[in-house]
Structure formats: structure tokens, C-alpha cells
């Protein structure tokens, strides 16, 4: 059984026991969070209707609330003028473990 969930502005394919990184959530380590399901597949049975999906949620436990993504360097450069600008960014993420699809 797996599900496609909406988590942090993205969609992720998850099964029970999976550990995924999502954009920063407002939750502490050990908290339980719920994600709405966009699609659930159970063997040959596919649940796709809005009424059926409203009854289903995917529960997850926060494993790490202080994870960070890779450092991304941005360089802006103007030719022949000596103008150069560097900037960096690291996305703040939350690590969650899927505990139930119900």
C-alpha cells in the first residue's frame, strides 16, 4: 500500500516506514503530523475520488525538525564592469517518518 501525499508544497510517494524530507513544518521533534492524501493505491484498488480521500490521512512522526538542504551558491555577474555578487541559500527542512496510512 502506498500513497501520494501533499507535504510542504510538494507531492511525495510514501509507504509506511518511509523517511522523507519536506519543507520546514511548524512541529517539534517527536510530534505527530498529518498529510492529506492525493491518491492511495492498495494492491489493485486505487482510491482517487475526493469524497473517499477526505476520509484518509497519512500520519507521520517528526524525526528531525532542524534539517537543512544542500548549500546553493548564486553568482550574479556583469561583464566588463567589475560587478559581481555572490549569494548562498540553504533550505530549512523537516525529516518525517510515515507511521500510518488510514
From Swiss-Prot:
| Keyword Endoplasmic reticulum attributed | no
This chain belongs to the protein called: Large ribosomal subunit protein bL21
In Gene Ontology terms, what is a biological process of this protein? translation
Tell me, in a sentence or two, what this protein's role is.
This protein binds to 23S rRNA in the presence of protein L20.
Q: Which family does it belong to?
A: Belongs to the bacterial ribosomal protein bL21 family.
Q: An example Gene Ontology cellular component term from the record?
A: ribosome
- Write out the GO MF terms: rRNA binding; structural constituent of ribosome
The answer to whether UniProt assigns keyword Ribonucleoprotein to this entry is yes
Its keywords, alphabetically, are: Ribonucleoprotein, Ribosomal protein, RNA-binding, rRNA-binding
Classification via Pfam families:
Ribosomal_L21p (PF00829)
Show the HAMAP family listed in the entry.
Ribosomal_bL21 (MF_01363)
What the entry lists under InterPro entries is as follows: bL21-like (IPR028909), bL21-like_sf (IPR036164), Ribosomal_bL21 (IPR001787), Ribosomal_bL21_CS (IPR018258)
Q: What is the annotated quaternary arrangement, including any partners?
A: Part of the 50S ribosomal subunit. Contacts protein L20.
Which organism is the protein's source? Bifidobacterium adolescentis (strain ATCC 15703 / DSM 20083 / NCTC 11814 / E194a)
Amino acid at each position: 500500500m502506498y500513497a501520494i501525499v501533499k507535504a510542504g508544497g510538494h507531492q511525495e510517494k510514501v509507504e509506511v516506514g518511509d523517511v522523507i524530507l519536506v519543507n520546514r513544518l511548524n512541529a517539534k521533534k517527536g510530534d505527530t503530523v498529518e498529510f492529506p492524501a492525493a491518491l492511495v493505491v492498495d494492491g489493485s484498488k486505487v482510491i482517487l475520488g475526493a469524497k473517499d480521500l477526505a476520509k484518509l490521512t497519512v500520519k507521520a512522526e517528526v524525526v528531525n525538525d532542524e534539517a537543512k538542504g544542500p548549500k546553493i551558491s548564486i553568482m550574479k555577474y556583469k561583464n566588463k564592469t567589475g560587478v559581481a555578487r555572490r549569494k548562498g541559500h540553504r533550505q530549512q527542512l523537516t525529516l518525517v517518518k510515515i507511521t500510518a496510512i488510514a
